Amino acid sequence: RLSDYSGSLPFNPTLQNVFLFPDVLLDLMTNARYGMGSFIKDEMIDLAGFKEASDWCSNRSYFFNGAIAEPVNTRTYAADLAATHLLYFAEINGKFTLRPALPVSGSSFTAADIKGLFTVGNILEDSYQIEYLSPEDREPIEVSVSYREERTANDLTSDGSFPVVREALVSESGYAPLDTVSLDMTDYCTQRVHAIDA
């Protein structure tokens, strides 16, 4: 059905049952049995965007190690989880797309090409408004990210014979954070680097 897609679908769990979020979302959107496939047609999906997102997650080892056990609003779920994979989920030109939120070239970040400068001087009068954040909203924060650590081998004597919830604290160096924001990724994240990047 999705013969033009060259990501890791159909699911072939060769890497110890490790999946990528773009592939899971694409399957959820196109599968008529347990997903939205009876409502979302193939032509309503930007496969190139999903492929780019799948490559991005694969290159950065952003795996989706979880299950969708409860009914979810697909759009809300996709947008929320996309952000924790440094992706954005959108509808562009009538097609659902999932793309890296940062400019990328292959597996690395690239500088964005500047197309133009938009300021008060070159925009129609009264069509441009500048709004500044209050000083309280600009204070540095600390982010507490929870993720799941699991045993990587079948050796029962190794650490992690049961999943362990780990926490990573991320803050800007040189500043004392005034507030701590919590981000729970234990449902699907098992990589410390992924948790910190999110």
Give the label of every model feature segment:
Residues 5-198:
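C-terminal extracytoplasmic interaction modules
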Residues 1:
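Secretory-pathway-linked proteins and extracytosolic
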